[in-house]
Amino acid sequence: MGERVLEIRELKNCEIDDIMKIWLESTIEAHYFIKEEYWKNNYEVVRDIYIPMAKTFVYCGEGKIKGFISIIDSNFIGALFVHTKSQGRGIGKSLLEYVKNR
């Protein structure tokens, strides 16, 4: 069953650490076959280079960011991540639909 969308909006600079936690946890879980240290070593590159070069939108529910999508050059999905505890609720689909309709 899908989660009720409370808000999808553009990322605020003060929320970068929040989405980076989602990125790190989701990436480690999805890529269990790659050493965790690899992702931790690339954390700063993602935070300092890739996130700033993209337009990022966050999915908020229950007062927390539950997922995000980053668009590069207005037409390329550079990232789509949903918090591991919120997966399977239609959040990723909602984020995709949001950017497709912008």
Which residue stretches match the model-derived regions?
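Short, Lys/Arg-enriched N-terminal segments with co-localized hydrophobic residues
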Residues: M1-V5
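A short beta-loop-alpha structural element at the N-terminal edge
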Residues: L6-K21
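Residues within well-ordered alpha-helical secondary structure of globular protein domains
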Residues: I22-E25, N101
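Conserved GNAT-fold acetyl-CoA-binding loop/helix
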Residues: L24-R47
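A short helix-loop-beta-strand connector motif used in the catalytic cores of GNAT acetyltransferases and
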Residues: R47-V58, F76
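Conserved beta-hairpin
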Residues: K55-G67, I72
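A short, internal acetyl-CoA/4′-phosphopantetheine-binding micro-motif in the GNAT/acyltransferase core
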Residues: I77-Q87
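Conserved acetyl-CoA-binding loop-helix of GNAT-fold acetyltransferases
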Residues: G88-N101
